[in-house]
Amino acid sequence: KSVQHIDKNLDGVITKMIQDGDFSGKNISTCVVRNASKNIKRLILVGKEEGSSVQDRIKLIELGASNILKSYITNAHWVIDDNYEDWEIEIISRSILKINYSFKGNSKSSLSKLDLVCLNGHSLSNTETCTQYGEAVGRGMNLCRHLGNTPANICTPTFLAEKAKSLSDENTCIKTTILEESEMRDLGMLSLLSVGNASAQPSKLIVMEYNGSKTMQQPIALVGKAVTFDTGGISLKPGRGMDEMKFDMCGGASVLGVMSALSEVALDINVVGLIPAVENMPSGNATKPGDVIKSMSGITIEILNTDAEGRLILCDALTYANRFKPKYVVDIATLTGAVIGALGKFTTGMLSNSEELAEILVSCGNSSGDRVWQLPLWKEYDQQLKSNFADLANIGGEAGTITAGCFLSRFTKDYKWAHLDIAG
């Protein structure tokens, strides 16, 4: 109906574009009409078919946002009607921020104002709420991306800790505590500390608490792996592509992005963010294959490969999460290359000890377009972690994503937990 209304007021320009074959209206098709009227310099049309998937609907919104941003216009209007769901309105504002992001800060867009024009009775007040939520998520996403893109000589564990502190300084709803190496050693976090032994950069455990609930409800704990640069340690990675190992802290960056978004939207929940931050380097002080270390939980671990280090920092952070008596714990980590072989680059691998939590994450993934696929935590895989010299080994042969999840599950017996392998 909104398209018909616009077409009528523009003397049938949309009908003419379709009749001339310039615009098909098919899913994710697009057309830009220049000088559609005296006051409209650009009319951007994006095709949306009935029954489009969530992924396609996100793509078409991002396509519209991209066309707006590259049109060199200062003011734009986005027409919405009762065919738009609330989450799609959130995606509009999120997409503008996402697409306009530039690490160098040299975005060429001249857009200064985007108004949503509501037709056919869509609630303006609800639209404003959705827009604000989308902007908060968009800024959180861009913070995550920016931290990931920052070179490892700048984005060190200390740098991440300072970012977390500055976020809490700006928002009274967030409390940040930084555990230094001496404090972690006193707590028995020798697994976490073993990864950063050889680095000149001190390891940190960043603890962020968002208390938005008016009641004493149990918090949700998010644990994000942050290896700010991963050489593999003594089990050295090949040189090709090693520059991308600065992205091995994106689990931790995701947690920071979530906390940033929470500080803006003021949700009525409690969330704890735990970010173990280390740098994995080789030197005379490095942990060696064959070494046995003791985790905070008391479980001993034989290190068979120092490049399987993410699980070594996560296991102590997962043990530390116990003190918050969490309702759920979700860890987010670029943990295994094996997940790319299993699922490619379109899906997050998930393992969980709770079908309740797994179903929540699958549902959220389907509704947001950021899908997950559950992998099994069967005892046959867990048995591959047997060690002759410790309680378990840090690698377990085939099915590396699953055995990594089995490793982490040993430290999550006291709560409902899920692991998200975001390496893909």
Functional labels for PLM-detected ranges:
Residues 1-226:
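Short amphipathic alpha-helical segment within the helicase RecA-like ATPase core
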Residues 28, 38-39, 75, 160-424:
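A generic structural signal for tightly packed, nonpolar segments enriched in small/aliphatic residues
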